[in-house]
Amino acid sequence: MNFNTILEEILIKRSQQKKKTSLLNYKERLCVLPKSVLSYYEGRAEKKYRKGVIDISKIKCVEIVKNDDGVIPCQNKFPFQVVHDANTLYIFAPSPQSRDRWVKKLKEEIKNNNNIMIKYHPKFWADGSYQCCRQTEKLAPGCEKYNLFESSIRKTLPPAPEIKKRRPPPPIPPEEENTEEIVVAMYDFQATEAHDLRLERGQEYIILEKNDLHWWRARDKYGSEGYIPSNYVTGKKSNNLDQYEWYCRNTNRSKAEQLLRTEDKEGGFMVRDSSQPGLYTVSLYTKFGGEGSSGFRHYHIKETATSPKKYYLAEKHAFGSIPEIIEYHKHNAAGLVTRLRYPVSTKGKNAPTTAGFSYDKWEINPSELTFMRELGSGLFGVVRLGKWRAQYKVAIKAIREGAMCEEDFIEEAKVMMKLTHPKLVQLYGVCTQQKPIYIVTEFMERGCLLNFLRQRQGHFSRDMLLSMCQDVCEGMEYLERNSFIHRDLAARNCLVNEAGVVKVSDFGMARYVLDDQYTSSSGAKFPVKWCPPEVFNYSRFSSKSDVWSFGVLMWEIFTEGRMPFEKNTNYEVVTMVTRGHRLHRPKLATKYLYEVMLRCWQERPEGRPSLEDLLRTIDELVECEETFGR
């Protein structure tokens, strides 16, 4: 075994059947787990040929497969699954001890991944469906809650030591296991419950436990301990940019320009992620452009080909780290239009939402809610602006009696609360102990995207519209990655906050509607104009039906809020779409943008791109005008 290898063993893998025509077979493979990948080889250790490799960062779930004494057609009878990208690898171990060892080690390796599934399928995919829930789509959302940290591994007794042999001494534990994890707070956080810990921006904290993806136990410099939101802190490492005020992680070119323009300060700047993974861009504002007018410049941070590599904005001034570049150009323009004078950031201004108001808190006491003005009404009832504990602004949906399948929703709400992303409207909790039930969510100041577009027609640039598409696609890609289907994506179900960020709302809620006019494809309220053929014909929802709806949403955005097929009835739309008719190209959309929409409207689901592919395409379009930097 190689020194860097964690595990190495001959196991049996089942073919992943990535294509419908692929045969189902079971093959013996040498499985090797180093630090960054899971590889499997044909042959033995002496002479082996790699047949496959899975990047550890792409793994979303590792778990034992529940088989209920079903027939396993190979000699190894102890299965576990590795879910990665859009595939599931089933592996069969020769003993329960072997299986437990692999599952435990793999879980340890993926514990810091940001794509861990919320629900998974505990049983095999076989004969065209999952044996646990009988869903027939391979990408169907999981049916059982998945908690990476609640291990299902059985504790097995160690083998009895041989009497005549002396037991070897235990291995010396590696030093790094005892090192403390120190993080830095990026935002202030006020403790709302006794078990919470207050965060002060810029202060350091020691992490004690990570038993929940969204809430970690920590200790401050005074010795106080409690739970903190994990998205409010970042690791204290010299190469971690999150700790710097000038770094804005989730900011595209259009939003960067908007922030810089709002600050309106000479030399205002920020560092943000480039559309090319692993690269960064410096966005810079000057009031005195080349011809005396204000303007923006976007400079790519380049890397040298030397070892160790260096970074630079101006080739003559290369440094060993990005913070060193920024520090240098704060004092020297050196080829830039102006010095980096004033860092512009969202840190400290707009703290991200948290998964609930506190750790393990999803039931909200209605006496803690203050009701204010009405915001609107929808399928489920009236929505009002309110406050929680007279401090935090929230939106409160009062569920009209008979409008929702309440028992099913309450159970699902616990899972939905753990869906947290900057481009999703956060569910904070529910009030279920009285009637009507209340759903408490993040408040979005500018209301629904559809009205936002219609009220400001003629005032949007193409960049601004594309940025809206990017926001929605980021939220939808997160749902896809977590095997969660929206089912009713449209401009009316997206909201806009004060900063102009668009977030996806009401994801998954369509499942709980009891109104036949909305749930039946023949009903007058059924959203036919946003649905692909497999939905209005067979009610087959999947992430690929969400892709179709996303294409229609793009059309809504680039028509500034027009109704799709506005002159046609639902019945006429079904006939037209079935015959291959598609929405026309909006005037504000380029030919290439319209081609992206048409890809979303392919008749067969497998012909449509994934939301991950769409996001990559849109990211490239957003950044395509960045031509500065030499």
Swiss-Prot record:
Segments forming domain SH2: 246-344
EC number: 2.7.10.2
Organism annotation: Mus musculus (Mouse)
Membrane topology: Peripheral membrane protein
Protein activity control: Activated by tyrosine phosphorylation by a wide range of cytokine stimulations. When T-cells or B-cells receptors are activated, a series of phosphorylation leads to the recruitment of TEC to the cell membrane, where it is phosphorylated at Tyr-518. Also activated in response to SCF. Integrin engagement induces tyrosine phosphorylation of TEC in platelets. STAP1 participates in a positive feedback loop by increasing the activity of TEC. SOCS1 is an inhibitor of TEC kinase activity.
Major enzyme class: transferase
Signal peptide: none
Task performed by this protein: Non-receptor tyrosine kinase that contributes to signaling from many receptors and participates as a signal transducer in multiple downstream pathways, including regulation of the actin cytoskeleton. Plays a redundant role to ITK in regulation of the adaptive immune response. Regulates the development, function and differentiation of conventional T-cells and nonconventional NKT-cells. Required for TCR-dependent IL2 gene induction. Phosphorylates DOK1, one CD28-specific substrate, and contributes to CD28-signaling.
Needed cofactors: Zn(2+)
Residues reported to bind ATP: 375-383, 397
Catalytic activity: L-tyrosyl-[protein] + ATP = O-phospho-L-tyrosyl-[protein] + ADP + H(+)
The name this protein goes by in its record: Tyrosine-protein kinase Tec
ZnF (Btk-type) intervals: 113-149
Binding locations of Zn(2+): 121, 132-133, 143
PTM summary: Following B-cell or T-cell receptors engagement, translocates to the plasma membrane where it gets phosphorylated at Tyr-518. Undergoes also tyrosine phosphorylation during platelet activation.
